[in-house]
Amino acid sequence: NEDKGTGLLRHCLLRRGVMTGQVMVVLVTAQPVLPGAKNFVKALLTEAGKQGVAITTIVQNVNDRKTSVVLGDMEKVLYGKGFILDELCGKTYALSPRSFYQINHTQTEVLYGLAVDAAHLTGKEVVLDAYCGIGTIGLTAADHAKQVVGVEVNREAVHDAIGNAKHNGVKNARFFAADATRWIGEAAAAGERADVIFMDPPREGSTCLLYTSPSPR
């Protein structure tokens, strides 16, 4: 009960790779101990299999705070590797429980393609992917740029972005765990320059802005 703070299982989060079909189950609990975890996992895998669903990984996420935020900071892998893979714009991405990933796969591919085309990249540009998450926009642009720099405050997402670049053989991308606004200011003061900046979500202060949003207003 979220209002009273009682009970064990707060949420059950499902993620599925659109192109790979891989399935992740995230059990969000109010405490670290999940009684009968091994038997529960075994039963879940069995029942899912009967329905023709092959679960790739099961993760326990612990959120002991009194909040409406779904996921907490502590995680424990109960089955599999703790992540699933999916393909987007010709590249493969590892998705962990807290990774941000666009829900509408088809439209995301169209959107990213349009964004890269609108940037008129020639292969000579330094591209900054601000608020980069797991690196999907930056790595999509990497094939058309001299260098890509991604900045993201979520350290887990940056870890995924670095792994995604390595997995896809992208050698012209670097990722930093930092507040993007602050990092940009410090980089500019140090004399670093970017030819193109992708900002998702967009920010004020740009002289030329290609605005993309799931609900543009």
Predicted regions and their residues:
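Short, aliphatic-rich beta-strand segments
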Residues: 21-29, 94-96
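Short loop/turn motifs enriched for small/polar and acidic residues
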Residues: 15-17, 28-30, 61-65
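Extended interfacial segments that mediate partner engagement and assembly in macromolecular machines
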Residues: 1-5, 14, 19, 34
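Conserved alpha/beta core surface patches that mediate binding of polyanionic ligands
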Residues: 1-11, 74-80
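A structural signal for short hydrophobic beta-strand segments in well-ordered beta-sheet cores
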Residues: 12-14, 86
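Rossmann-like S-adenosyl-L-methionine
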Residues: 35-213, 217
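Short loop/turn segments at connectors of secondary-structure elements within structured domains
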Residues: 19-21, 54
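Short aromatic/hydrophobic contact patches that present stacked aromatics
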Residues: 13, 24-26, 100
